[in-house]
Amino acid sequence: MHRPKGIDAAIEALGFVEYQDKSEKRFNHYTLDRPAAGSGTSDFRNRYYNTPAQTISYYGQVNFWYWLGRSGFSLMPSYKYRGAHVEKDNDIYRLEQLAGWGSDADFGALPSEREYLERTYDAGNSFNRDQKTYEHTFDFCIRYNHEVGKGNLGAYLGMPVRLTKRTLDYKRAMIDTLFSKSNTDFSPKANIRYNWHNWSRSVELSYNMSTKLYDLVQTLDVRSDDNPLNVTLGNGALKNAVTHKASLSYTNNSSRKQRFFSAGVDYSAVRNQIGYSSEYNRATGVYTYRPVNVNGNYTIAGNVNYSMALDKKRRWNLSTATTAQLYNNVDIITVTGADENPRSKVKTFFLGETVKVDYRLGRQKIGAKLGCNWRNATSAREDFATVNAANFNYGLTGQFELPCGFQLFTDLTMYSRRGYEAHEMNTDELVWNARLSKQVWKKRLTLALEGFDILHNLSAVTHTLNGQGRTETYRNVIPSYGMLHVIYRLNVQPKKK
């Protein structure tokens, strides 16, 4: 908050209350075949999910400012209160347990309510969760803002202390438990910034620490096997995760010369990061997951950005962005019956570069772009295959003012990937997107027709590498689409007295 002229102290209060009532009903046909196990091993499930949920949240905050004369120092004590009450049911019904409701049953159909409520309830995976959260945060901040030399020095130190109490009432199969957990955490924040040369140049250093609380349900002795190939367990020994982040940045901008430069370095490390250990059973093909705390995860990243006008009339413009990142990812991976070290550490180095050139003539604009990034992932694991892969893209963009007030935005880009061990990840996809729009009715109403992946080259299946160097597959039901937008702009001016 900027200091109002002639004011030495100020107070501010705010708050809100929010209520949500949601209900979701889902149907699922699931078939698991095990050909290696012989005949009669097919597992078919006709499932119906009913998941109503109610949430009420409330928040209040009081801030107080006090400026210490002309010293440049100001004090800001504050208090925040946040509360929430969440009640959720997850009712699962195995309809195939009724005669005539197997694989031949109509998808999305339900038998009589009495039949499926009494005879098909999946008590082992259904649950009722009622959780209340009370959170108090006391913060004391010191700020400094003053002219120093030929520039301006700003500094900030925040010392928030958070007191949290959570109460969970949980019912599931043989479990009916009510318990509470209290937590106190300290999350300091600090920032120092110096601006000079009429605020066009600056250097900034910041640090903050934050605590993430584990989910209370994760600590329960619960087995979830709704997906028979992915079983989830609980862990009563979980600890809260603590993240440390630090950053250093420098900027040098010249509006007169149309040159902009920035560079930065970021570091983050997590202690007791909450992840899931995985154990694979080769005989059954089942993965068993369990929440655990892991240490050793950190990220170091750097970036350099530069843009400039290439000619005196500033019609040609060039921009570049360079990024470099080092990830150290630690996870717990085991195989049933194996003697290998379950701790899996993967180091990934990422280097990326993006270059764009634009030409503008009046209200018309065309551009060319080129992007490339290289990824190298290594691990001491015996079963790990080193990753040396590159993603690159190149294309053209355009923004045109057409007759009759129409505007056209278009983008034609080739996306390519090379060097992946999984051949399905080495792809070339030419993607064309366009948007045609027009403003009418004194520019209050905008009509726009948008087309995404007009050439239908994008695959509905996306393959990515996670932090452990493993391939993850995602499916998009609608990779290509067309959409009509109708946007009305409403401006209500206050009446003059």
Predicted regions and their residues:
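Primarily recognizes Gram-negative and organellar outer-membrane beta-barrels
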Residues: 1-497
